[in-house]
Amino acid sequence: MKKNLIALAISSCLLLSACSDQSSTSSSTNTSNPAASIAPGAPGQSSLWAYAGKTGIGTSYEQYTNGAYSDAGASGTISKVWFSIAQGVLTETMYGLIHEAQLQELQFFIKSSDALDEEKRDTISTTSYLKTDAQGRPLSLAYKVVNKDKEGKYEIEKHFFTDPDSQSLMMRVIVRALTDTITPYAYVNPAIANTGSNDSAAYSNNSWTATDGNSSMTLKTSAAVVHSTLGFEGVSDGITELKQNGTLSNQYSTTGATKGNVAFTLQLPTLKQGETAQWDFVLGFGKNAAESSASADKTLATGYDKVLAHYNGDGDAIGWQDFLQKLPALEKLSATATDGGKLLYTSAMVLKAQEDKTHAGAFIASLSNPWGDTKSAEQSATGYKAVWPRDFYQVAMAMLALGDTESPRIAFEYLQQVQAGDKIKGYTGTPGWFLQKTHVDGEPEWVGVQLDQTGMPLMLGWRLWKDGILSDAEISGWYKKMLKPAADFLVNGGAVKIQWNDKTITPPYTQQERWEEQQGYSPSTIAATIAGLISAGDIATHAGDTESAKKYFSAADKYSAQLETLTYTTAGSLTGEQGNGNYYLRINANEDPNDHSALGTSNAQIISDESQVIDGGFLELVRYGVRSATDKHIAETLPEYDNQQLPDLLRVKYEFTFPGVEGTFPGWRRYGVDGYGEDQSNGLGYVEANNSTQGRGRVWPIFTGERGHYELQLAHQLQSKNGSNKVDIEKLRNTYIKAMELFANEGMMLPEQVWDGVGNNDAYQYQKGEGTNAATPLAWTHAEYVKLLRSYSDGKVWDRNASTEARYVK
């Protein structure tokens, strides 16, 4: 790999007679301007985030030191920089805490003899990995992106990775002029301190720096920059001038005392037809301009080869290969995959990459802002770069499935930071439940009570104890300080008061179910509640608290006995050739599942009859061992759930085909009448609730995994009863595992949602089954895929709770 890259660099210099200087001391022709020229036009256009369908994310791998990230540990300096790639360009790049974006995008504009092209719109992009093994499996999150002009005039190749020894990102750029003379312009749109319109910008000494408060970003390059300017987006920035005048004449070097949505434009050397140029760009970060400049200088001085080798973990350096070598299940699970393990290796690293490095164990939902290119960046927002205990549980269990014993343990220990109690600022009320959504530092963001998010930490603690990762003494300690309050809340509920939420919770009635939208009795919520209580009962028994153990077991039994009475309709309005109107509801707002009562309006969708809405949450009852896969209530719900004759509004199941792949592959929406997705009238991003009734939630690959788990458990039970049937298991593997692999994009990122073919598709022209502009990669989806592989490899459902199964499945 190194030899090829060195050869490429040499050939680039030979092809371009004035090949750019690769040192960090390159000069720029615009440094001679003696007086600072202040850019007009503040604050510029309103700022937005970037397209959320990422084809790559990355950060440096760092080792824990005593359960934390420390500069004094084996990894040395902890690099707290994360990046993302979408539409062929660098998008949100974070520094500090994992949600603190500092960059909206960095892309190139190419001026040819007859046009000014925008890289992300006027090229065809491909994404691959810089380092793979002989089977093509990625060995690090270092990317190669090649963007080819749609008219064949030029090609831009870029390599992305971070510096493990600095707070910086490196991007190597190779530009090839194929059939025309071209001039590249680098365009940089900062979003310092996680907002897009409060930045100041300055140029000095070949450094382009943006600052907002205590955060700064500095761009440096080895390129001999011909001309540069800065300004306010859409008013005085360089690209706006190019579009208006065809040339860069302004030479603004500061925004002065005014702030806004700023952008840098760097004119690079012109390439004649047949010429190639290679340059390195570095984004450095810090608390001020001096720190960010020093970070960039350090990386440029270290150089491409050494930084990449360290990032990869080559030789003695600690990098991504070291992480992969710690996962003993990789080879076994690769044999179960249908792609040889490519998506598995990617998933393992993607899951690990979405952990904060200030608060070890804080795993977020996604390194993206859903529908970001339509979402305002005027105010700081985490998007999905936050902690949900439910998504968090999926990740921890997936890491455990990979054979990682460190990350799940540290994740479990982190959970005490997001548990309601006197440590949570502004909280008064009953302690024990886990906050709906928080920043990685524990700051509450959303504060609804979701009982499944309190059951899952109990399940995780139980599993870590049973697997020997937590000792008997340790689980007893955690029982007293974290698990007992959680279990008590699942039994007794109580008064909750934080921010807007002033409510008394009475389990198993939940204020919100797993889609965070409805209150009532939910099969999926009750499944996690029961499994959590059985886990708590086992732990309490071990800890010598027999009275509490009895209470937990008794409550679980009560909830199990009430389950069908509260959530199963025998008078449903969904019927078909096979359906008979008997099925689990998505949620029941009262104690009568047959009264056809209305549900609350959600995502602007009015649901006048709860029995019209079905989802796959009932399958969680089987996954966690609350019900048998052959239970008649489960079996009778499947026809309605799978009914593809329903109108699109109510329909949940869709089937997909992929070019060059034999067969059809199933997918499911969250539930009927789901409005969390693209606007059906124009194909644009999700519109906030009550603003549009045209939103449509699409198919989520998660549910292909959930169904694959159910089918495995069903096959296991039928095999136990009727004898072996290996052909059926192989068919399931080539249906559900393969489907999830096909839902991944070219960078092997698994999305939250894929296009289902319903509604206007003009905006993005998705192929059916292609990931949309919702959150990608979604940690939950990658976790579900990993767990599906582990389940099929083991021949039993990975998440299944043995104590729960022993109690309820006879």
Task: Give, region by region, the residue ranges found by the protein language model.
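Acidic/polar, glycine-enriched structural segments that form the non-catalytic walls/loops
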Residues: 33-45, 152-155, 163-383, 472-473, ...
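Well-ordered alpha-helical scaffold segments within catalytic/enzyme domains
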Residues: 175-176, 327-336, 349-354, 393-407, ...
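Active-site acid/base region of carbohydrate-active enzymes
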Residues: 334-364, 413-435, 456-524, 547, ...
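Extended ligand-binding clefts on enzyme/binding-domain cores
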Residues: 196, 210-242, 335, 339-343, ...
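Aromatic-rich carbohydrate-recognition surfaces in CAZymes
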Residues: 176-178, 201, 210, 307, ...
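C-terminal motif of bacterial Sec signal peptides marking the signal peptidase cleavage site
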Residues: 16-18
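C-terminal capping/lid segments that line or modulate ligand- or cofactor-binding pockets
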Residues: 34-94, 435-461, 599-600, 608-628, ...
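An extended acidic
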Residues: 33-147, 217-243, 317-337, 343
